[in-house]
Structures are given as structure tokens and as C-alpha cells.
Amino acid sequence: ASGFGTYAKNLLERLHASDKYELAEFAIYMKSSDGHDVPWKVYGNAPEDDEPDEHKQLYNSNPNNQFGAWRFDKVVLDFKPDIVLTYRDPWMDMFISKSPLLPYFHWVWMPTVDSDPQKQSWIEGFSKTDAILCYSEFGVKTLKKDAGHLLNVVGCASPGIDPNIYKPYDKKQIREELGLDPNVNIIGTVMRNQKRKLFPELIKSFAKFLKVAPPEIKDNTYLLLHTSYPEKMGWNLGYHISEEEVGGKVLATYVCKTCKRWRIDFFRDSLNYCPHCKTISSVMPSVGLGLEVPDLVKVYNAMDLYVQYAICEGFGMPQVEATACGVPIASSNYSAMEDVLQWTKGYPINIQKMYREVETNAERVFPDNDHLVQIMINHLMLSAEEKANKSQEVRNATVARYDWDDCAKVWMNYIDTYQPKMLQGKWNSPPRPLQIHEKVPEGLTNEQFVEFIYNAVLLEPDSAFGYEATKLVRDLNIGAQVDHGVIEPIDRNKLLERCLNQGKNKIVIEKIRSGQAQLQEDIFIKRANENYGN
């Protein structure tokens, strides 16, 4: 499961076990028919196999639909929630801030906050919530600094780990089971192969370690990469390993596509020989073909030191999975990583420099390679007793801080004490008189035109002078919509047409909500209700 999926499973299980709430899950990568064994209602976002082709075409027509944009309003119209909880990246859940049904439910969002400052468009979306939780103390600090006057930041609900699953094993025994020399040192990482994960710098640092470390540790030390390769937008790992001339010192995890067996082997590019089924069909793990959790625990336990080398993290779950297994971490001392380092007694890697990223306008970091090299040396030079003590220290600290029960209590404390506002929870309230004006008055400036759009077409007067509205004025003034990677012509007619569709959709949804029109029971809603009823 993804990190968000793991979070949802652990939170929902505890909310359900409390027997205090009626629950529904909007499962993004599930079909409703897959939810028959779940004890709460499950609405699937993925199209059913027997749905009409036009539904599947609609699903594929907008990238946001994979995150739920195309079905969210139908789900809340059917379930009529008092409160909606979300916990994903800003770009995944931002569509909820535009929902016509926003007045009828209390919304608590825990977005990932991986850098400072946050994008202004995200801040505006966050401001539509009733409360904000964060994955890390860094997130709380950043949002209060950037927009404390706009946001109700109520706390931190960091993920937990199951200490009965993520736990230390005898390292030599695990290595022998995996076919590894029990007496070597292994520096490892578990990161997806993405731009923000600094694989080239990690490989470069390891190469320098091999040059400057004392012979008694460098000769029997290896780098283990548990990652995906190749990735469409990821690093060319083979190139960087070859460039640094460390080919014989880098290990990788491989999973066989044919027999599904996995092993740790020397890095041999993206396709490798499987000794179990004797086919050339072993690949490096990915989201679609990964390891089961008990096997991932073995990967962590094979390591002496775990490294999270990234420009930023919204949390970085593998760090606490590693420390729960008694493996100390070294991580970039920035964003959520700085909190994880503090709570797990890890090794903070100094920041060499900060820079602004063009895509997000956020501060990102390059950690200090030389400092990482020194951390590697210092840790591997510890005596066996000192390593054992450090392992116990990081394990104890992790179990004390990252607990799923504590995580769920943060959410439950808020749910049990919040006060609904205005129409929240009043799904049977009388119809709201909504009317849009299609005829634009003549002689308006761009500023007046945008104000008219928000007041008379979108019916969102409170947003008429926000960031999005201000940007629309600017775009109209220059005749183009300008975002990172996007420069497209825009004019009043195009903007009016788009906003008229949104305004008319708002009126239709309000009619359905108030009983003046009927919501067609799509297959996914019918299956969700049937499964829950059974």
C-alpha cells in the first residue's frame, strides 16, 4: 500500500473500533465492489469493470479524477457526512476546496508540508478548511508562519508504526538468510526514484567514503538501494554508479516478475537474472511490484545505517520504519526530516545550501556530502557494544513517539469536540436561492469583470479578492494564463464560459441536495451501499 493508504487503514480501523462514528471511505484506487470485506462503507473511485465506456473515458479525461475529483460530490451527496477528513498532498485534495457542497460539511485536512514557503494557491485552498492538522512539527511551524492569520492549525497527527512488525532481528541471521556476508557493513536507503531524492549525491558521497574511510571499514562496506529503476521522471542510477566507479560496491533489491521471489544482489542495471526460476525477469521494486511488509522489514534489518537524502520530505515514512527496526538514520536536516531526526535520535546531515525551486517557489536544500561521509565513518567505527546501544536508543525513541493509537487520538479529540458552523451537517435544510447572471455588464475593467464573475457567476463573493481572483486579473491583463510549464491564451469569453459551467453545476448540485432533483444512482454508489448493507 502507499503511505496514504497505510495511514488511512490504521486511522479508519481505530475510528471504527471506537464504535463512536458512522464511517465511509472514499477509496481512490479501489472499486466499490472491492470493499465487500471492509466493516465500513467504501465508495470506490476507480471505475467498475462493467461501467459504461463513457464513464471510463470521463475518468481518464482529467488528471485530478484519479484523486477523486469526478466523484467526490456524488459521494458526499449520498453519504451526507457531518465531517470530512483528508490527509493527502495539496494537489491531490485541492479540488475539495471548490466543491459546491463545502457549506454542508466540516472539513479537516492534513496536507503534506515539505517546504517553506508554501504556494499561495495552496494557502488559499487550505483557508477553505475548518481545521488543519500536520504530519510534522515542521508543518505546523511553517503554516503558522506563512498563514497563521488565515488557517486554524490545530496540531500534529504524525503516522505511527507497528512495533510488533517493524522490529529488530539478529542482523547476521537476516543477512545469512538473504545470502549476504554477515560480517559486512551495509549503508542503505528506501526511497522512490524521484527528482527530489538525491540519489546522485548519495552515490557520490559513498564513493568519497570509499576513498577516505579507514581500510578496516571501507573494504567491507556496501551501499544498498531499495528503489524503483527505471522511472520516467527519475534518476539514471546505472549512469551515476558507473560515473563514480562504485559498481562492485552497490547492492540493490530485485523482484522477479515471473515467480515473485525477491533477493538482494549486486546492482546489475534494471533487469537481472532470477536464480529461482532461471529467467531474466528480475526487476527493481516499484509501487506495482514491491515487497510485502515482512520482507521490507528484513531489508531494513540488513542495514547498519539508513540514509534519507532528499531536498525535502512531507514526512518520510521509511525513516521511522528503519529506526523501529533499530537502524539509526542520517537525514537531511530540513523539513519534516528535522523532526524525525530529533524524535528518533538520528544523525542530522548539515545543509550545504538552500535554493528556490522553480516549480513550487519553495526553499529546497542540498545536504553536505562531506558531512554525510563523516557520519558514515563515525557510525561504522563504533564498537559492537556502542552500535547495539545506539540501535536500542533509536528503537525506544521511535516506539515512544510514533504510535498509531496516539495518531488516532488526535483526530478523535478534534471530531469529538468540534462545533459545526452554519449549514454544516444540515443536509435537509431548505434550498438556497442560487441564481447566476450570464449577461456581463458593459464597460467593465478586468478587475471589475473578475469581481462580477465571482459574485454573479461562481456565487463566491468571499473569494472575489483572493489569490486566485487576483491572478485571473493579471492573466487577463497580459492575455495569457501563466503557470509553471503553462502559457496559454486566455480572454474574457473563455473565462466566462468556464465559470458559467461551474456556476450551473453548483445550481444542479444544490437542487439534488435539497430534493428538487434526483441523484442518479451510479453503479459505484449502488455497490457501495449493497456491500455495506450486507
Task: State where each predicted segment sits.
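Extended catalytic core of nucleotide-activated donor transferases of GT-like folds
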Residues: 38-131, 137-138
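Nucleotide-activated donor-binding/catalytic signature segment of Leloir-type glycosyltransferases, i.e.
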Residues: 234-298
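C-terminal amphipathic helix plus adjacent low-complexity
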Residues: 271-273, 278, 358-365, 369-448, ...
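Short hydrophobic beta-strand element within catalytic cores of glycosyltransferases
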Residues: 328-331, 341, 345-348
